[in-house]
Swiss-Prot record:
Entry GO CC: cytoplasm
One Pfam entry name: tRNA-synt_2
Record keywords, A-Z: Aminoacyl-tRNA synthetase, ATP-binding, Cytoplasm, Ligase, Nucleotide-binding, Protein biosynthesis
One of the protein's GO biological processes: asparaginyl-tRNA aminoacylation
Primary location group: cytoplasm
Similarity field: Belongs to the class-II aminoacyl-tRNA synthetase family.
PROSITE patterns per the UniProt record, alphabetical: AA_TRNA_LIGASE_II
Official protein name in the record: Asparagine--tRNA ligase
SUPFAM superfamilies attached to this UniProt entry: Class II aaRS and biotin synthetases, Nucleic acid-binding proteins
Amino acid sequence: MQLKIKEIFDQDYTKLEGQKVQIKAWVRSNRDSKKIGFLVLNDGSSLTNLQAVYRVDKISNYEEITAARMWAAVAIEGVIKLTPTAKQPLELEVLNAQILKQSDEDFLLSNNDLSLETLRLNAHLRPRTNLFHAIMKVRATLAFAVHEFMNQNEYSWLAAPLFTGNDAEGAGETFSIQKFDNEEFFGKQTHLSVTGQLQAEAYAQAFGNVYTFGPTFRAEKSHTNRHLAEFWMIEPEMAFVDLKGMQDIVENLIKHVIKAVLEKNQQELEFLAQRNDENLIKKLQKVVDSKFERIEYKDAVKILANAVKSGHQFEDNEIFFGMDLGSEHERYMCETYHQGPVFLQNYPKDIKAFYMKLNDDQQTVASTDLLIPGVGELVGGSQREDNYEKLLKRCQELKMPIESLQWYLDLRRFGYYMSSGFGIGFERLVMYVTGVNNIKDTIPFPRSHGQIEF
């Protein structure tokens, strides 16, 4: 019978002793002597390798198999033999072996001491390392868990457009589409989208609960370990839900996806804990078990100011109401002050987007950021402004192009009672759950300023 390596180790493999199995896999290593050789095999189904023992008196092509290089593709037929006193609990006694495709001698990963930067420059090969195998397995589980949560809670998935005629965030950091045959292809200046939120609001007013989950683009000339030019966003939008209700949904979603990884990817997490953060699994379990605190922005400013007075040093020690909190301030709130996930809420309107609902104090908006230890901001969301006149006034104050946003304004004219939504940078979520330090290591082929290979 043909099996995956994961299938062998995930079952009671003692019952497999003496059984004949077929494996198709890649060679991780191959060592031999005159009479016996040892292949270490991996087929991508697990971080666990399978050792296959081949002998000169058992196979007719012994010399050919001794030449199988690292990452050669092979087909092996053999008998399972238990090895309880050895490092591995079982091995495969080879009866037949075939090299399906040899690997060239200059295979990069033959060098086991490669830096993360070298692997980023060779992103087509890095999934063959244990590190990126583990990261991408966790990423896949997180993505599935997002869709699972949304499906269980009756959200409809929306395929938001990637071309847009407006900058929804108002930050101006968009990629512009070049003219086609010396004319605007869409009849006006067009950009790659930075968010699917505006379109999600339109559908939420018909479906109730919707979400987008797809790529977004931001033209930031940043070379930090926290920024990408192309990244994925999870953006749910809910009609008839206020800020508090939205925070409850955020908390439930974050706990659901982390719990899914804890249940499905224990092997990968144990490897990543050894590689990145020895407390990784405890950290994730703490998030699942904790209650997310909620703190007013104005109170956070007081807490930070008191920290400075008590001798704590930030790079930016000038703390005042109206400031846009930096990553160091956010991390202080969730790592030092609260020591757990915390929602900051009701930010000053001047540092938030135009579409957020103005509070009764006329100074703040019904917005929230979820701060997570080790990352800082992971989720940003708000209750949307439902009053047509207030939204129009805010657009005018910010000198935004009313004509291209008129359809969005018009939603408020037709039963738009209440809507709230949030965005999660998917790669930042992967960073947190895997413990990696650079966001470029959380996406298969990273795109950032000056980098467009592959």
